Amino acid sequence: MSDVAEKVKKIIVDQLGVSADEVKPEASFVEDLGADSLDLTELIMAMEEEFEVEIADEDAQKILKVQDAIAYIEEKK
């Protein structure tokens, strides 16, 4: 797992209070990890801060799964 993937996974575990075992690349933030809209906003903000990137609102709406977040951050770095 890449450094970005590890950091994204840690952010998700910290923000959503889920176990690391639940955070799989194909996991949906809402359906599999139980996130609501506020959780998603906080996740995006935490990722922006950790990776020093800005995630546009229209891009944030497309980040639905763990792998989407990892791929987006890797592309922006």
UniProtKB/Swiss-Prot annotation:
Keywords: Cytoplasm, Fatty acid biosynthesis, Fatty acid metabolism, Lipid biosynthesis, Lipid metabolism, Phosphopantetheine, Phosphoprotein. GO terms for biological process: lipid A biosynthetic process. 4'-phosphopantetheine is transferred from CoA to a specific serine of apo-ACP by AcpS. This modification is essential for activity because fatty acids are bound in thioester linkage to the sulfhydryl of the prosthetic group. The modification O-(pantetheine 4'-phosphoryl)serine is found at residue 37. Carrier of the growing fatty acid chain in fatty acid biosynthesis. GO terms for molecular function: acyl binding; acyl carrier activity. It holds the Pfam family PP-binding. Belongs to the acyl carrier protein (ACP) family. It is found in: Cytoplasm. The lineage of its organism: Bacteria, Pseudomonadati, Thermodesulfobacteriota, Desulfovibrionia, Desulfovibrionales. Residues 2-77 form the Carrier domain. This is Acyl carrier protein. GO terms for cellular component: cytosol; membrane. InterPro entries: ACP, ACP-like_sf, PP-bd_ACP, Ppantetheine_attach_site. Pathway: Lipid metabolism; fatty acid biosynthesis.
